[in-house]
Amino acid sequence: MRSDIFYWKCDHALSVESKKELYFADKYSTDSISAAKSIAQDFLGREPVEFNHLKVDGNHFAYYFSDGGTKFFLRTDDGLSEDCYMLAESAIMEELGKSAMPVPKVFATSVDLKRFPVRYQIMEFLETPSLNTFYQQNTLNFRSIARESGMFLSRLHQHKYPNFGFIDIDVLSGEKRICGSDRTWAAYFNKCLDKHLGYLQDNQILSSETIRRIEHIFERCKAWLDIREGSLLHRDFAYWNILGTPEKLSAVIDWDDAVIGDPADDLGIVNCFNAPDFMEILLESYSAISPVDETFKSKIWFYTLRNMLWKTMIRHYMGYFDRDKKFFLNKNHLNLSLKEYSLEKINQSINKLSTL
């Protein structure tokens, strides 16, 4: 259970050094590849015709295999972390698939570690590239993708479930239903908040005065957290988790961070990465299905601020601020370094919320 986690990649118990080993593309070992190939063989009932590991960053291992006709995508964990959230991811994609939402089809999920040393999912292999490919190449049609994103998120947020926060794995496993593990949205929002603020202050990333202003904003706006019903949120709706063409979204992947909560939080995540004109078009598209008011727009900045805290923390301790210009996060619409951009987004959020 993710009972004491706000954002898994930032807050789970692995050491920083272990996270660095796990999150980067050179993490694949002979043992991890061998285990994955055994899973593929077990699934097919015979040796796969094709099998390759995909050199991707992130907290999972990714592989491609085929039986000579159908292609499959295999995703595993490291077998070390006590986390079974793949069950939630698979249940979410199954539910969304019933509504014809563009998500991968899942064929198998296992988290019991009985037969293999890792937890895993087997899904359809989608050959369409991520939108980050086009973003990095400067060929992305921002207006079209903003409209597509607004439509997708508005449809996603029509899916509502009891409680808040991460999906309760015990309930999902025992009762076969989706619900959150927190009784209130505020309980989830405040998880690890003191840790995030303390880290940023202790490492002199944010000043004591800035921390005080942030705490004041969260206290003053805490009534926004009093919501009665939560929507399904992706919580990492970024270009690398969206597949498609320069003009069109074809699938949304990686539901590892999905929670039940305030729809404005999902848009706050998007706002962490995108320019005002992108957000304006997205909101126009979003509001065609789910009308928004000025309070909703202010809440987007409220959640942008909350999410930029953990983002800045993980970017610092993972050494992202020291990566060269080729690092994918170093490209942004303000043409700033990643550290400058992170601090600018925090300052923008504070300034927007201070004028309310």
Model-found features: residue ranges?
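Active-site acidic catalytic loop and adjacent metal/ATP-binding pocket
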Residues: 58-65, 74, 106, 156, ...
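Short, surface-exposed acidic
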Residues: 45-52, 207-211, 291-299
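Glycine-rich, phosphate-binding/catalytic loops in enzymes
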Residues: 91, 139-140, 251, 268-270, ...
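ATP-binding pocket architecture of kinase catalytic cores
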Residues: 50-190, 205
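Short, surface-exposed alpha-helical segments at coil->helix boundaries
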Residues: 33-34, 90, 280
